[in-house]
Structures are given as structure tokens and as C-alpha cells.
Swiss-Prot record:
Designated name of the protein: Transcription termination factor Rho
Subunit structure as annotated in this protein's UniProt entry: Homohexamer. The homohexamer assembles into an open ring structure.
GO BP: DNA-templated transcription termination
HAMAP family attached to this UniProt entry: Rho
Residue ranges of the region described as RNA-binding 1: 61-66, 78-80, 108-110
Residues annotated as binding ATP: G169, K170, G171, Q172, R173, G174, K181, A182, G183, K184, T185, I186, R212
An example molecular function term from Gene Ontology annotations: ATP hydrolysis activity
Record flagged with keyword Disulfide bond: no
InterPro entries per record: AAA+_ATPase, ATPase_F1/V1/A1_a/bsu_nucl-bd, CSD, NA-bd_OB-fold, P-loop_NTPase, Rho-like_N, Rho_factor_ATP-bd, Rho_N_sf
Region span, RNA-binding 2: 284-288
Length: 419
């Protein structure tokens, strides 16, 4: 029996399975408790159980494998990892581990890890000699992640506009600057769908901090990737713990030369959570932001990089502006110059119900010549010169009208040439 397969089943199937196995009074229990009871019953029959999770090492030296399905929240179905195993395999917080597990003995509360099969989807012996993430060499992104699907659909317009005005590469540190109701969540869904379709080798994680529960469900159903969330009814400590688990997991995968993409909604809310959690330093900036509160969110955002030795970590985060909160403005100002790609959304365009509501003149990617071919770059510059004299709303309306007549950006450039 596999622990992961059980976690992916809906609660109705699990309750039916519990009934078949003769476990009673489970209808009012939490999903994790039902899984725990099923595994315990299954283990008594002497069959092997396998499980996996992301390691979180606690201060006492031992650790637990947390589940991404539960957004790395501590639960009864977590798997205990002993300090001797952590030392033997040189494990760190964020390592993704698959292995055989055993049921809890008398007086124990958790399942325990018996044998490690893989670490970060690699053989355990390969994981011992990995170079630490902080010691790897960061570079500008050089490999492009195309956003367009090439099917000419209206959903594809967002991807095509991003490709034209702010191309995204592997290792990009991007900021989507968004006022309320400008369509940032839908844009993130589109970006996630495009990355999953055009770059299936990429490990995609969507991290939702302080979001509405219904948006989390929608994201889980539309995105082919890992969706980790901490909703607005959770305490700030929980937001921080989730974000730190996600970034540690991403770093460990990059050490194994994997390409990882994190889509974060939103970095403003994460910074607010850190501001609440950290001990007061006594120095307070404008808007009530503690002087040291933004160090860790900056470390999170700054982890995005293209790695010379192989692998990359891309972070596309949304920053909230025009919310009426001075704190949000201060947080945005602090993050403003740190990214190497910026995509501002415009409230005026969104109010006219024109989507994507991208302000083309202000958006762009640093060193875009490393991501695009020379002829394409020349065409993009000509397009910018053409759109620059126009008003922001007129520019995006003009571009969308022209894109709708063609299926791909190459076709669009050819039609431009003919005119």
C-alpha cells in the first residue's frame, strides 16, 4: 500500500475503504486520521507500506516527512525520520524522500522511515556529495520558456503578450505588479498552464499565501503541478512555515540540477506575515514595517537564479499596489529593483475589461537579448517604438486586436512586415 496514493483519493473513497476493512466511527474524522487508521490496519496484515514526503528537520535533531497535499502542515500521517538516518544520508530540510515505512510501535505516535529508496528523485548515494545551493554560481537566464501555445485561442493571448513584452527564461526573478481586480490570479493560472505544457521537464510549484479557499481549489483543479497554500484564515506563522518549506524543497531540487519554477501569490502578503512573526527590533519604517522584517522575504525572492553548474530556480511573484495600505507600498518599493523582469498590470485597462491588463511600455526583462534571437529582438523593439506614443489602454487594445487575427507571434510579425 502506498501512502501517497491514499492521500490523493477523495475522502468519500477513503471512508468506503475504511468500512470495507472494518474500521468504524470514521465519518467525522479528519482525512489524515482516516489515512492513519487505514495504514495501521494494513500494517497489521504484515504487508509493506511505502511513503514519501518533504523532510522538515526540527531543533531536536530528528525530522518528519511532511505531505505537499496537506501544504506541509504537521499531521498524524507524517513519517518520523531518526537523527541517525539524517546524519547517515547528510539530509537537510527540503529533501524529498521516498522509502519504506513501518507502523508505530507501542507508545509511539507516528509511522517511522525504515529504508530510504530515493532522495530528490535520485539514488541516496548520489545525494551525499551535492554542492550546497549557496555555493552554486548564479547567472543571467539564457534558456527561454515560451508562453504561447500556438493554437490561436483567447486564453493564449496572455502568454503571447508576455512573450512579446517581457520574455521569461529559466532562472528568472519576475515581479507582476498588480492593483486589486486586475486579473493577476488568472494570469498566474495561464503562466502555470503554459509552463506545464511547453516545459514538462520543469518542476512547477504554485505557492498561495493568504489567499481565499475557493481560489486555492480552483488553482488545484486547473494547474498540472504542485499547489501549496496557506489561506487567509491561517495564522502568519503558518504562512511563513509553508513558504520556508517550499523554498528549501526548491533549493534541494536545484542542487540535483533540476529546473524549478515557483509562482508566488503574493510576496506582499508573505512580507506582511514575516512582519508579524519576527521579534520587534525597535526600528519601524513607514507604514509599520519593521526594519528587519523584509530580510527573509528578500532571501526567498533572491533565491531565484540560473545556475552555471546546471539547474535553475525561477520565481514569478505578484506584488500588490494601490491597495490603500502604506505598508503594501513600502513592501513594493523594497522589492522594486530586485527582480530582473517586471510586468505591471494597469487598473485602467482592467476597468475597461480588457485582459491581459498589461502596461506594455513599463514592462520588460533585463538582458532580454540573452533569451531572444537577434531578428526577433529587432521586431520586438520596432513593436515597442510603434506602441510607445499611444496611451497604455490604446496600446494593449491595438496589440490584442492584431494578435487575434493570427495564431502565433511569428505569424503576427510576418503580417507586420507585409504592412
Amino acid at each position: 500500500m502506498n501512502l501517497t496514493e491514499l492521500k490523493q483519493k477523495p475522502i468519500t473513497d477513503l471512508l468506503q475503504l475504511a468500512e470495507e476493512m472494518g474500521i468504524e466511527n470514521m465519518a467525522r474524522s479528519r482525512k489524515q486520521d482516516v489515512i492513519f487508521s487505514l495504514l495501521k490496519k494494513h500494517a497489521k496484515s504484515g504487508e509493506e507500506i511505502s511513503g514519501d514526503g518533504v523532510l522538515e528537520i526540527l531543533q531536536d535533531g530528528f525530522g518528519f516527512l511532511r505531505s505537499a497535499d496537506a501544504s506541509y502542515l504537521a499531521g498524524p500521517d507524517d513519517i518520523y525520520v531518526s537523527p541517525s538516518q539524517i546524519r547517515r544520508f547528510n539530509l537537510r530540510t527540503g529533501d524529498t524522500i521516498v522509502g519504506k515505512i513501518r507502523p508505530p510501535k507501542e507508545g509511539e505516535r507516528y509511522f517511522a522511515l525504515l529504508k530510504v529508496d530515493t532522495i530528490n528523485f535520485d539514488r541516496p548515494e548520489n545525494a551525499k556529495n551535492k554542492i550546497l545551493f549557496e555555493n552554486l554560481t548564479p547567472l543571467f537566464p539564457t534558456v527561454r520558456m515560451k508562453m504561447e501555445a500556438g493554437n490561436g485561442s483567447t486564453e493564449d493571448l496572455t502568454g503571447r503578450v508576455i512573450d512579446l513584452c517581457a520574455p521569461i527564461g529559466k532562472g528568472q526573478r519576475g515581479l507582476i505588479v498588480a492593483p486589486p481586480k486586475a486579473g493577476k490570479t488568472i494570469m498566474l493560472q495561464n503562466i502555470a498552464a503554459n509552463i506545464a505544457r511547453n516545459n514538462p521537464e520543469v518542476h512547477l510549484i504554485v505557492l498561495l499565501i493568504d489567499e481565499r479557499p475557493e481560489e486555492v481549489t480552483e488553482m488545484q483543479r486547473t494547474v498540472r503541478g504542485e499547489v501549496v497554500a496557506s489561506t487567509f484564515d491561517e495564522p502568519p506563522t503558518r504562512h511563513v512555515q509553508v513558504a520556508e518549506m517550499v523554498i528549501e524543497k526548491a533549493k534541494r531540487l536545484v542542487e540535483h540540477k533540476k529546473d524549478v519554477v515557483i509562482l508566488l501569490d503574493s510576496i506582499t502578503r508573505l512580507a506582511r506575515a514575516y512582519n508579524t512573526v519576527i521579534p520587534s527590533s525597535g526600528k519601524v519604517l513607514t507604514g509599520g514595517v519593521d526594519a528587519h522584517a523584509l530580510e527573509k522575504p528578500k532571501r526567498f525572492f533572491g533565491a531565484a537564479r540560473n545556475i552555471e553548474e546546471g539547474g535553475s530556480l525561477t520565481i514569478i511573484a505578484t506584488a500588490l499596489v494601490e491597495t490603500g495600505s502604506k505598508m503594501d507600498e513600502v513592501i513594493y518599493e523594497e522589492f522594486k529593483g530586485t527582480g530582473n523582469m517586471e510586468l505591471p498590470l494597469d487598473r485602467r485597462i482592467a476597468e475597461k475589461r480588457v485582459f491581459p491588463a498589461i502596461n506594455i511600455n513599463r514592462s520588460g526583462t533585463r538582458r532580454e537579448e540573452l533569451l531572444t534571437a537577434d531578428d526577433e529582438l529587432q521586431r520586438m523593439w520596432i513593436l515597442r517604438k510603434l506602441l510607445h506614443p499611444m496611451d497604455e489602454v490604446a496600446a494593449i487594445e491595438f496589440l490584442i486586436d492584431k494578435l487575434k487575427t493570427t495564431k502565433t507571434n511569428d505569424e503576427f510579425f510576418l503580417s507586420m512586415k507585409r504592412k
